[in-house]
């Protein structure tokens, strides 16, 4: 059986003999953070590694709203129009099955593109553009078939986590009477942003804990990204609004 490019690259990466080889591999996997500039680059590295998952909401708008509206397709609401005991919809019209699955697919495709562009890129010399499959192996649970399907499954899983976090935030907002009404924002920026970010990083910590995106050196930058998520989310929403993918800039 022909060895995949990722397997060959990983075998070569870890093939050095003895302690010198081990230290060399560890050095290549380290994320320098001696200066403020290094830390800023690591924050950008985290943003790029997790960017496909963060963009799941854009994919959800594409598959759940723009495409159905453009081609006259009917989307299917996740809550089926059901009303909670508080008199509000469980989730609302903004949460559809097409958006949920489409968001995951969008993220999966973006991780495949990232792997294609940055395959083999290491932290020691290529930050912030790191291969998301840098230390992945065929024995990993998400490696189904080959490296490309592995990249897709990784992205799809984190994108789905993003969408589930967004749904959780929406559910809580509606229970608190903070649901969005037409052009009026829900006035709950933290519930609009933090749940999906937390779900993404929790999913990564549980399901991809041995991957480069969960390297211990990236823990402080990950915390920084969570804190910055409201600003990042707002920026993506404005971009989606200007591209015509969203009807409102929030």
Regions found by a protein language model. Name each.
Residues 7, 13-202, 212-250:
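Interhelical loop and helix-boundary elements at the membrane-water interface
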Residues 206-209:
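Selective transmembrane helix interface/packing segments
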